Amino acid sequence: MIIEPRYCGPPDVGNGGYVGGLLAAHVDPAGAAEVTLRRPVPLGVELTVKSEGNGQAVLLNGTELVAEASALAIRQEVRSPKDGFGVLGSPPPASVAAAQAREAGRRAGPRVNREQHPFPGCFVCGPDRGPADGGLGIIPGPLPGRDLLADEWRPGEELAGENGQVRTEFVWAALDCAGGHGAIQPGLPPYVLGRLKVRPLRPVLAGHSYVVVGWLLAIGGRKIAAGSVVYNSSGKAAAVALGTWLPLPGAAPRPEAPAGDAPDGAAAAG
């Protein structure tokens, strides 16, 4: 496995969700897995995927452990908003209309002021990237009156396999950055993904409109837990994720957002 430089998160490091999705596909065909990142993932370097059996695999850079994946044991279809979300431990927020998510994305602080983004070159959510150069263009913004951030996502054909479904690594990448934006507010130091657990529920199809949301779940010591969901146009969850984030060592806090830019839950994140 080689992570191409265009799939970066922080500078010179692979996007955690993208890498996690690639590794998850080695333990579960649908990408239902938990991936733990043990060290920054280098770009343009040949890495080795080693199956450990029993639905487990590791990613190695030479002899160094980079990441490890475990398949989720139970897969459920969602029949109501309260079913099948054991990954989060609680029901997710209600879905958001695409028009509302689109407007929230336009209000996103990093989209208005790139200095608010710790990694503006991130291929998923960086303001310096976009669909024209292979970026996903997902920059969630605050929804008035709700403790979550959202953006619309219309994945292009280039992200899909032959069946028209968006490949696992790109769905994971979208969930990764949505959760990060939802939980880690301006004023906090930059955080990086440590662990991501994803349960795919329905196909994500290229060319269709989706809503991606992220929100704060909990803060424990240095760690922040974030939830994220990709909703389809019917308001049903296509994929749900739980992410654990860790502060980047030695990083300075980000600039504060202008008044009104942060969601209602921002104070809890601080």
Please tell me what each predicted stretch does:
Residues G137-L148, G161, T168-G182, G187-P189, ...:
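Conserved mixed alpha/beta catalytic, RNA-binding, or beta-rich assembly cores of soluble enzyme
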Residues P189, K197-G260:
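Accessory, usually C-terminal, subdomains that scaffold auxiliary metal cofactors
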Residues E4, E52, L72-I74, R154-G156, ...:
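Solvent-exposed residues in well-ordered beta-strands and their adjoining turns
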Residues Y7, P11, V19-N54, D176-V211, ...:
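Hydrophobic beta-strand-centered segment that forms part of the acyl-chain substrate-binding groove
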Residues M1, N54-V58, S70-G164, P263-G270:
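Non-catalytic linker/capping segments at the edges of enzyme domains
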Residues A25-P91:
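Extended, compositionally biased flexible segments
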